[in-house]
């Protein structure tokens, strides 16, 4: 491209001034000339290289309207297993299990080691007051469960017992086999005999009772029909024994 004439004139002027200045330095400095006339700006130069990245700017204030919620993104990859939590509350009981196998047969028991309470007592010189029939003369009292002063059997071995009585009378007579637990009456079995001729008759009765430790058993008479014969001609007896213990 051919350079404009204006540029050539300027370049020749600058070159002449430089040569004159150089010649003056060898001899003596002359007075500076006047500034040249101002010219029009030249054309823009070519773009320079890309500059370095600047510092981040301050956060801008949100001025626009908030847009709509976007679509749900894809699920991320599973995270690592967490720590074991605290034990939870106990669940409900499970169903009963299947019956176990039959155990090995045990050694035979020793009948001598088994307790076998039993008693039998008759009336000889009992007290006349009260409604409890006292059988004061003991015939047998295995393990001492019968208390002759009270007329009561007090259970010490839980199980099933058989009790029986035979009482002689010449009058109308009603008797009861009584049992109590913690001083509360549990059973009351009545047996009556009506005697209009005044002859010797025997009133008898018996029963099987399941007893726990501390239960009491005795014979009790009706206050209005409770006269018992007392003499050497006939005896009245009260007996009882353990049939088998409770398991």
Swiss-Prot record:
InterPro entries, per database record: C1q_dom, Collagen, Collagen/C1q_domain, Tumour_necrosis_fac-like_dom
Pfam families assigned: C1q, Collagen
Biased composition (Basic and acidic residues): 27-38
Ranges where the C1q domain occurs: 112-247
Location(s) in or outside the cell: Secreted; Cell surface
Cystines in this chain: 174-192
Keywords: Calcium, Collagen, Complement pathway, Disulfide bond, Glycoprotein, Hydroxylation, Immunity, Innate immunity, Metal-binding, Repeat, Secreted, Signal
Feature: compositional bias, Low complexity: 98-109
Signal sequence annotation: 1-24
Positions of the UniProt region annotated as Disordered: 26-116
Gene3D superfamilies reported for this sequence: 2.60.120.40
4-hydroxyproline PTM positions: 41, 47, 56, 59, 81, 87
Regulation: The C1Q subcomplex is inhibited by sulfated molecules, such as triterpenoid sulfates, heparan sulfate, or chondroitin sulfates.
Recorded domain comment: The C1q domain is the ligand-recognition domain, which specifically recognizes and binds the Fc regions of IgG or IgM immunoglobulins. The collagen-like domain interacts with C1R and C1S proenzymes.
Xref: PANTHER family: COMPLEMENT C1Q SUBCOMPONENT SUBUNIT A, EMILIN ELASTIN MICROFIBRIL INTERFACE-LOCATED PROTEIN ELASTIN MICROFIBRIL INTERFACER
UniProt name for this protein: Complement C1q subcomponent subunit A
Organism: Sus scrofa
